[in-house]
Curated annotation (Swiss-Prot):
Expressed in acontia, a specialised envenomation structure laden with batteries of venom-containing nematocysts found only in the superfamily Metridioidea. May affect sodium channels (Nav). It comes from Calliactis polypus. The keyword Disulfide bond applies. This is Sea anemone sodium channel inhibitor type I. Belongs to the sea anemone sodium channel inhibitory toxin family. Type I subfamily. The keyword Magnesium does not apply.
């Protein structure tokens, strides 16, 4: 019984993760209320994104927010 429950949970999680991935809409960072950041040039401002910048956004600085590594991204 326990093995079947574990297998069911694992299959469900992987099924949802693989099924949702390609169909997820592009993030709307304007509505995200993200933390603002300043790029390396000191004048351009962007939004902190944990991990890497999403499509349509460009990298301008690597930074940390508390203990989360990420990038400061500006819209192209």
């Amino acid at each position: 019984m326990n093995r079947m429950l574990i297998i069911f949970v694992v299959v469900t999680v992987f099924g949802l993760a693989s099924g949702l991935g390609p169909n997820m809409p592009a993030p709307d960072l304007a509505k995200r209320n993200g933390k603002g950041c300043t790029c390396n040039d000191g004048t351009t401002t962007g939004i902190f994104w944990a991990g890497s910048c999403p499509g349509g956004w460009s990298y301008c600085k690597t930074m940390w927010y508390w203990v989360v590594p990420g990038e400061c991204c500006t819209q192209k």
